[in-house]
């Protein structure tokens, strides 16, 4: 079986796709380079925003045209959009052979392979992907927060934490196969709780793995970010000084309408605690503009917060209603053009701040972990999450190297290995 995977959406989807690759590889399946080589094309989908679903539909349209000329190819849709729309996908694209929702992702590999033959169950699955320096591992699935704009609880289900021993063993296996950095994933990692092991305890157990050099995690919810976690970030050298904490808005009125369960004052207090405990921490965030009821004053509160906090980076999104959510019942009263304007204003301010932050690194020497090389250029990352590029050799991959920074752009640094 030759397979081609197209992944849309968050890092959890990337992790799910990696899981499929590892299982397929264990059974001797091969990754195709393009549609022409594939026996099956797998589309891993996202439902968080309408734009992600439109991207999936566009891709399915292209594959449908290909299948008309190559009827033997199988088309499989998995993930969050598959969970939300289910059989309705086949009504629009009859060429789709199999639909597997996010709640059944653990069975996806065998279901896909059974499109071709049925003797897989007796074989042992090897879940390792070799040679990747940075590896992701899902520590929990689902979400119990029910933010009013978000479809995740409906498509991924309620929170379920994975056995901590299973996680640590998998991380150990990844490190033995070359990983040097592990990124722990969950819709809300701060809610992790398996028996008596909470998230801070899980990080301690993970940090004890020999030869593991870095630990990151995402995504965090402000209402659950604990003092214990901040203490771990301050005292455990393997934990990177980088944290993504979605703010979404700085207007308490909008935060309440979003059902975020915290105030802007609480959020700002967390940032101050983090920066006191971990002075070099880089804080990144998500912001939604144009949420129902967001006035000019509400937006200005958010813009002021961006200027005050000076995030290391941010993702800003224009609100779009998602089916089944509470916000979808609200009047979407911010005109599209105004959403675009607010989006542009926040992005411009964020880019200005980012340039100011990275420009301070010009002339400095940064220790980075070399992750990969392409055309003689090494892609590496600082401990606080900045991407760094430099000319180098393959033998640097997986090692810490020092780079003298010569050029700074919004999201990247460039320099020479010293």
From Swiss-Prot:
One of its GO terms (cellular component) is cytosol. Residues 1-118 form the MTTase N-terminal domain. Its main location: cytoplasm. It is found in: Cytoplasm. Pfam families: Radical_SAM, TRAM, UPF0004. Binds 2 [4Fe-4S] clusters. One cluster is coordinated with 3 cysteines and an exchangeable S-adenosyl-L-methionine. InterPro entries: Elp3/MiaA/NifB-like_rSAM, Methylthiotransferase, Methylthiotransferase_CS, Methylthiotransferase_N, Methylthiotransferase_N_sf, MiaB_methiolase, rSAM, rSAM_horseshoe. [4Fe-4S] cluster 1 binds at residues 10, 46, 80. Its cofactor is [4Fe-4S] cluster. One of its GO terms (molecular function) is N6-isopentenyladenosine methylthiotransferase activity. Residues 359-418 form the TRAM domain. It catalyses: N(6)-dimethylallyladenosine(37) in tRNA + (sulfur carrier)-SH + AH2 + 2 S-adenosyl-L-methionine = 2-methylsulfanyl-N(6)-dimethylallyladenosine(37) in tRNA + (sulfur carrier)-H + 5'-deoxyadenosine + L-methionine + A + S-adenosyl-L-homocysteine + 2 H(+). Keywords: 4Fe-4S, Cytoplasm, Iron, Iron-sulfur, Metal-binding, S-adenosyl-L-methionine, Transferase, tRNA processing. It is an enzyme of class 2 (transferase). Catalyzes the methylthiolation of N6-(dimethylallyl)adenosine (i(6)A), leading to the formation of 2-methylthio-N6-(dimethylallyl)adenosine (ms(2)i(6)A) at position 37 in tRNAs that read codons beginning with uridine. Monomer. HAMAP family: tRNA_metthiotr_MiaB. Belongs to the methylthiotransferase family. MiaB subfamily. NCBIfam families: miaB-methiolase, MiaB/RimO family radical SAM methylthiotransferase. This is tRNA-2-methylthio-N(6)-dimethylallyladenosine synthase. The gene is miaB.
């Amino acid at each position: 079986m030759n397979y081609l995977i197209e992944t849309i959406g968050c890092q959890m989807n990337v992790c799910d796709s990696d899981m499929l690759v590892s299982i397929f590889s264990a059974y001797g399946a091969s990754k195709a380079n393009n549609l022409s080589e594939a026996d099956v094309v797998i589309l891993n989908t996202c439902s968080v925003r309408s734009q992600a679903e439109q991207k999936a539909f566009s891709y399915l349209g292209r594959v449908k045209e290909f299948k008309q000329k190559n009827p033997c190819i199988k088309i499989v849709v998995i993930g969050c959009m598959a969970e939300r729309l289910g059989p309705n996908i086949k009504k629009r694209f009859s060429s789709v052979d199999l639909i597997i929702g996010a709640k059944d992702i653990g069975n996806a590999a065998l279901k896909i392979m059974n499109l071709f033959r049925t003797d897989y169950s007796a074989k042992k699955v090897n879940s390792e992907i070799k040679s990747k320096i940075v590896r992701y591992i899902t520590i929990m699935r689902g979400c119990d927060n029910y933010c009013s704009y978000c479809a995740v609880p409906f498509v991924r289900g309620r929170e379920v934490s994975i056995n901590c021993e299973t996680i640590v063993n998998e991380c150990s296996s990844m490190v033995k196969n070359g990983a040097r950095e592990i990124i722990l994933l969950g819709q809300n990692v701060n809610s992790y709780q398996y028996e008596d092991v909470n998230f801070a305890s899980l990080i301690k157990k993970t940090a004890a793995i020999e030869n593991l050099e870095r630990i990151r995690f995402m995504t965090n919810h402000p209402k659950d970010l604990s003092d214990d976690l901040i203490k771990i970030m301050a005292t455990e050298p393997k934990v990177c000084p980088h944290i993504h904490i979605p703010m979404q808005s700085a207007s308490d009125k909008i935060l309440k309408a979003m059902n975020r369960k915290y105030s802007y004052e609480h959020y700002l207090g967390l940032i101050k605690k983090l920066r006191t405990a971990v002075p070099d921490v880089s804080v990144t965030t998500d912001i939604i503009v144009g949420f129902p009821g967001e006035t000019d004053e509400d937006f200005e509160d958010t813009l002021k917060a961006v200027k005050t906090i000076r995030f290391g980076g941010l993702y800003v999104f224009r609100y779009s209603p998602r089916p089944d959510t509470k916000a979808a019942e609200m009047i979407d009263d911010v005109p599209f053009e105004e959403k675009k304007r607010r989006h542009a204003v926040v992005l411009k301010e964020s880019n200005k701040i980012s340039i100011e932050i990275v420009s301070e690194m010009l002339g400095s020497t940064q220790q980075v972990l070399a992750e990969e090389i392409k055309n003689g250029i090494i892609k590496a990352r600082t401990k606080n999450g900045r991407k760094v590029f430099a000319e180098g050799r393959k033998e640097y991959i997986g090692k810490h190297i020092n780079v003298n920074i010569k050029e700074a752009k919004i999201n990247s640094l460039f320099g020479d290995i010293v």
